[in-house]
Amino acid sequence: MKMKVIAMLAALSLTASAAAAQELPRKVNNVEVLDLDGKPTKLPYWGEKNLMIFYVDPDRHKQNNDFTVELEENHRAQGDNIYGFGVMNLKDAPMVPNGMARNMAKKRTAKNGALVLADQDRILSKAWELGDCNNQFVLMIVSK
């Protein structure tokens, strides 16, 4: 009987925490992550434009590849009122060294002109209460 109560309480607490993480929309604050050279930087155009942010796990960088390539090649995530960019979730990619992931992103952005930033310590996912982003391709819209 005690085990059933404990299991039910554990399930309830997990459900409640997951539900809290999914409550939208909510106010978020700008965070400081790293540029591809490893220097601290804030998210661009904060409060100036609507932002389309791709929060990507480098272990699973091919998720939604067709969608991402379409946006990059046709600059569909850029305009007078919107700016799109990527943030690599490096903490959840332990098999990919941070420097290697940043160098791969540098090569890709040199070709397509996109902006990619690096989050080495889940700063963005913690600050914005995104929950578990491991192996996920998270697309976020942040309004100005």
Which functions belong to the PLM regions below?
Residues A7-T15:
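Bacterial N-terminal signal peptides
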Residues H61-T109:
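Structural microenvironment flanking redox-active thiols in thiol-disulfide oxidoreductases
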Residues A21-T41, K62, D66-F67:
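N-terminal "domain-start" segment that seeds a small globular fold
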Residues K42-N65:
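Short active-site neighborhood of thiol/selenol oxidoreductases, capturing the structured segment around
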Residues E48-L51, G79-Y83, K111-G113, Q136:
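Loop/turn elements at helix/coil->beta-strand transitions in domains of secreted/extracellular proteins
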